[in-house]
A protein has these predicted regions:
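Metal-dependent nuclease catalytic regions and adjoining charged, substrate-binding loops involved
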Residues: 1-7, 138-231
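Metal-dependent nuclease catalytic cores that hydrolyze phosphodiester bonds in DNA/RNA
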Residues: 1-109, 116-122, 126, 140, ...
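Short, surface-exposed linear patches
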Residues: 54-56, 131-133, 173, 206-207
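Short amphipathic alpha-helical segments
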Residues: 58-66, 131, 189, 193
């Protein structure tokens, strides 16, 4: 993807987002495979033809800026921070993932997310859980034990006024702009996520042999997915 800076915004902003768009042969990230596969493959195939201006990438900048700040924090002796893992599947493709923190004592993988308040109101956590589950699966391939995951969220549009209104109406609204949600994993969950990963990459391997117009269209669920959130 070609990132432009038509409005001459500060160079650090441009550098921040421009470093995000790199593709490797036969390798896709945990986040990427949650997208519609046709969109994923066509974006990779035609990346040099796609253009986006830094002025339209506020959501990405917010998320990256948050991670840059948290990178400076000191991890504990039982913690692994900002680790990048890659695992090769039997078909020669690789799945990668970069999680924010793993705590060996808690046997928990953790990630930081920026989101809209609607994410919490609708409790729409399926994509978060699946992404962290893939990270957990990658960790188990490196002989780490993972029993749960934790999402630490930062709500960008949280409003104290809306919170008070929701209280008066008896409606749910998150009490704070920063919080966390947790999920636990069973052995059966790891069997299922491995099956999902293998099937996903087998589909990718098949689709990459097809012409653009021969690749099946994304499912309705996939079309609603937008990378870090559901539209």
């Amino acid at each position: 993807m070609k990132v432009t800076n038509k409005y001459n915004l500060p160079q650090p902003l441009y550098n921040l987002v421009n470093s995000e768009y790199t593709y490797k042969d036969k390798q896709f990230s945990a986040t990427a495979i949650l997208q519609g596969l046709k969109s994923l493959i066509l974006t990779k195939r035609h990346t040099d033809e796609i253009e986006q201006d830094v002025s339209d990438m506020a959501n990405l900048i917010f998320g990256l800026a948050l991670h840059k700040v948290l990178e400076d924090s000191q991890e504990g002796d039982d913690e692994l921070k900002e680790a990048y893992l890659v695992y090769m599947l039997e078909n020669g493709y690789k799945v990668s993932g970069r999680f924010d923190l793993y705590n060996e004592t808690e046997m928990s993988v953790k990630d930081y997310k920026t989101c809209s308040v609607w994410k919490l109101k609708f409790k729409d956590f399926d994509d978060w859980k699946k992404q962290l589950h893939i990270y957990a699966w990658l960790l188990t391939k490196c002989d780490f034990q993972v029993d749960k995951c934790e999402i630490n969220y930062f709500i960008k549009d949280w409003s104290p006024k809306e919170f008070k209104i929701a209280q008066l109406k008896g409606e749910y609204y998150p009490e704070h702009a920063i919080g966390k949600v947790e999920f636990t994993f069973t052995k059966e969950d790891f069997v299922e996520i491995e099956k999902y990963i293998v099937e996903r990459f087998n589909q990718i391997a098949t689709y990459e042999t097809l012409e653009d117009d021969e690749i099946p269209v994304c499912s309705e669920e996939e079309r609603w997915y937008s990378g870090s959130k559901w539209a």
